[in-house]
Structure formats: structure tokens, C-alpha cells
């Protein structure tokens, strides 16, 4: 009989949101209260850092931008990160795995993300980036900046996930609110981090440790991450289908994946046939030569729900693949059902001249909602 395995030590997982878009994504995760992960926000914009819910922040390029944004100039973002490499190295050092979140096409995220990724790789850290591409209406120049930034970032990360903002309109429909649309994109990062963190930090019937995760994700290039949750008699099949649909991710063909990591999260009622159903779904799209790792995480709070998180890596190593999406009528509903916000009070800040995290003024839930719903600033932050 299988017994839950108690882990003696946990891998150190950190998430770094860079610029306005990356900061928004990490704030979304903070509200979701994901355990076993440290969160950091990095920005040239001092005002944005003062307003963020993220508990640990690093201001970069203060002598270059004077505390303002990068002005949609990636070179300014790059130089700002180069100026404060020591402060960035401090927040990365000691981590086993780092997720980098950024909106590409603006200044801070586009320019600083590759620098931060390079620091992480030099420290021997497993580095995964999840980035957004700008809307077409934002202009050709911003899209070119985004492509250049993604190309540079890909040189310094183990795995790279790309979320095109234009898919928000195509997948979620024109009637979706702006707040919910960007929340859907933020959910991609949240589910990826949560799924991997739970594999490593939660006891399970089938144990997966950090070495397994590193095998699947190290030096793999383009990747896909998806998560689905369902309940009822067919919950295993349905959640697996939703997970591999990933409608908000860059168009990908999963059949060439070189590595597949799967986390099944459920209560103590998880059945053997459900485990088999998820495994069959994974085998249906992965190649015979792929390294497949499947683990379970036990969470009594799931009740009769079952969640499947899939990480497929090494996709299109020679060229970017053509579209091959699995459609599912319930996937949009599940994305929307996962929305929800919780607010934290604790806030700290760290700058080049102050490596100790100092407390700053607490904000109320109403203040945070007002900041987040201020549309012009929100659009500016998402792009920068």
C-alpha cells in the first residue's frame, strides 16, 4: 500500500516579477497565497514598487531613471539591471529554481529580464521565464522590441513560456472585462508555479523531487504549461484535457515535447483509475523518447475536485512549431472560475543602498482595488 512520503527538505523556489507586467503577475500570485514560494518585484519605477502588494522589492537604475520608468526603452531597462547586479544577485542567490515573469515590448521588463536570467544561470539556478507579447494595436515597434527581448531572454533560461496578449481577445471573447482578461494571463504563471511547487513541497502518494523537475526542465528551450481542474465522475479526463489545451499560450505542437512533468492534486479519494487516465492522456501527445514524470500532491481541501498541471518542455528545438490546439468548451469557464483575490498587508522594500527589507505603509483592500482598476496606469504597467 502506498504511504505519503514526508520530505525532509524543500527546494527554494523564487518568483521575480520584472517591470509593470511582471509585477502585476506576481501580485496576482501573492493574492492567491501560494505556499513554499518567495516573491520579488523588480522595477525602475519607484512609485510602482511603493504601491505593490509584493513583500520584497528591488529598485534598479535609480541613477539612470531617477526613480521613473524606463520610458519604453529596453536599453534603459538593460542598463538599469546592469547597474544593480549586486542587489539582484542577493535576491537570487540560494535559490534552486527561479521563475521570471515579464511583459515584453516595453522598457524595464524587456531590457532587464535577460540580465536577471543571466545572473540566475551563472549562479547555477534552474531558470524558467514566462512572458507576454504585446497586443497588435500597440504598434510594430513594440512588437519588434518584444521579439528581440524574447530572443535575448531565450539564451539565458532553461525553459521559456510565451503568452500572446492578442489571444486574450480571441479566446475569452470581446465581452470580457479588462481586469479579467489580464487575470487569465496571470493565471498561467500562477498555475505553473503552484503545480511545480506542490510537487516538490507537498507529501504525495507518488513522490517527485527537485531532481526530477530539473531533469524535465533544464536546457529545454520553449515550453508549455497548463492547468485544469474538474469534479465529478470524469474529473481526471476533463482536467487533463483542459490542462493541455492552454488556450492563452503561444501556438504549439505538443507531439514533439522532449520532457513532460505532470502533477495530480486531489484529496485522499484519488483513485488508481484516475491516475491511469491522466497518464494515458499524457502518453497520447508525448513522443516515445520523451522523459515523463508524474507525481501526486495530497490536498484535503480539494474535496471532490482534481487538478492536473502539465509542463511540456523541449518543444520545437529546431524551429517554432505551427498551431495545434485542443479545444474544450469548458476551458474558458475554468479559467474564469479560478479568479479570486486575497490581500496582504506586509510590505518591504530593498534598494541598492539598503539591503535590509524595511517596512512601508500598509494599504487597505479598497486602496489596492483602486490602484489595480485605474485603467490607464494598468495598461502602462502591463506593457512596461
From Swiss-Prot:
GTP binds at residues 20-24, 107-109, 138, 142, 186. It is found in: Cytoplasm. Belongs to the FtsZ family. It holds the Pfam family FtsZ_C. Its main location: cytoplasm. Homodimer. Polymerizes to form a dynamic ring structure in a strictly GTP-dependent manner. Interacts directly with several other division proteins. This is Cell division protein FtsZ. SUPFAM superfamilies: Tubulin C-terminal domain-like (SSF55307), Tubulin nucleotide-binding domain-like (SSF52490). NCBIfam families: ftsZ (TIGR00065). One of its GO terms (molecular function) is GTPase activity. Keywords: Cell cycle, Cell division, Cytoplasm, GTP-binding, Nucleotide-binding, Septation. Essential cell division protein that forms a contractile ring structure (Z ring) at the future cell division site. The regulation of the ring assembly controls the timing and the location of cell division. One of the functions of the FtsZ ring is to recruit other cell division proteins to the septum to produce a new cell wall between the dividing cells. Binds GTP and shows GTPase activity.
Amino acid at each position: 500500500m502506498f504511504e505519503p512520503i514526508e520530505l525532509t527538505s524543500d527546494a527554494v523556489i523564487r518568483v521575480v516579477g520584472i517591470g509593470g507586467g511582471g509585477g502585476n503577475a506576481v501580485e496576482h500570485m501573492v493574492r492567491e497565497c501560494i505556499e513554499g514560494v518567495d516573491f520579488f518585484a523588480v522595477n525602475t519605477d519607484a512609485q510602482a514598487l511603493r504601491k505593490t502588494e509584493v513583500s520584497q522589492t528591488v529598485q534598479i537604475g535609480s541613477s539612470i531613471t531617477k526613480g521613473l520608468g524606463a520610458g519604453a526603452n529596453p536599453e534603459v531597462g538593460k542598463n538599469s539591471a546592469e547597474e544593480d547586479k549586486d542587489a539582484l544577485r542577493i535576491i537570487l542567490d540560494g535559490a534552486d529554481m527561479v521563475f521570471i515573469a515579464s511583459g515584453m515590448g516595453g522598457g524595464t521588463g524587456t531590457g532587464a529580464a535577460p540580465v536577471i536570467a543571466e545572473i540566475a544561470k551563472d549562479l547555477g539556478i534552474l531558470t524558467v521565464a514566462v512572458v507576454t507579447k504585446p497586443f497588435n494595436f500597440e504598434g510594430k515597434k513594440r512588437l519588434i522590441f518584444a521579439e528581440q527581448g524574447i530572443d535575448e531572454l531565450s539564451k539565458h533560461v532553461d525553459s521559456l513560456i510565451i503568452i500572446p496578449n492578442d489571444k486574450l481577445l480571441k479566446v475569452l471573447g470581446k465581452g470580457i472585462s479588462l481586469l479579467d482578461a489580464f487575470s487569465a494571463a496571470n493565471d498561467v504563471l500562477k498555475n505553473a508555479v503552484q503545480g511545480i511547487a506542490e510537487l516538490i513541497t507537498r507529501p504525495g502518494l507518488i513522490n517527485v523531487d527537485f531532481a526530477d523537475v530539473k531533469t524535465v526542465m533544464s536546457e529545454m528551450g520553449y515550453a508549455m504549461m497548463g492547468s485544469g481542474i474538474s469534479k465529478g465522475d470524469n474529473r481526471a479526463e476533463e482536467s487533463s484535457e483542459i490542462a493541455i489545451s492552454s488556450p492563452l499560450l503561444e501556438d504549439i505542437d505538443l507531439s514533439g515535447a522532449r520532457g513532460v512533468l505532470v502533477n495530480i492534486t486531489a484529496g485522499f479519494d484519488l483513485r488508481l483509475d484516475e491516475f491511469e487516465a491522466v497518464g494515458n492522456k499524457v502518453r497520447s501527445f508525448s513522443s516515445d523518447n520523451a522523459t515523463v514524470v508524474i507525481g501526486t500532491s495530497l490536498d484535503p481541501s480539494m474535496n471532490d475536485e482534481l487538478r492536473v498541471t502539465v509542463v511540456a518542455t523541449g518543444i520545437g528545438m529546431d524551429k517554432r512549431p505551427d498551431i495545434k490546439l485542443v479545444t474544450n468548451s469548458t476551458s474558458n469557464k475554468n479559467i474564469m472560475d479560478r479568479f479570486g483575490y486575497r490581500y496582504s498587508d506586509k510590505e518591504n522594500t530593498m534598494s541598492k543602498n539598503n539591503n535590509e527589507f524595511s517596512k512601508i505603509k500598509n494599504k487597505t483592500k479598497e486602496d489596492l482595488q483602486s490602484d489595480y482598476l485605474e485603467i490607464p496606469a494598468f495598461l502602462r504597467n502591463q506593457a512596461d
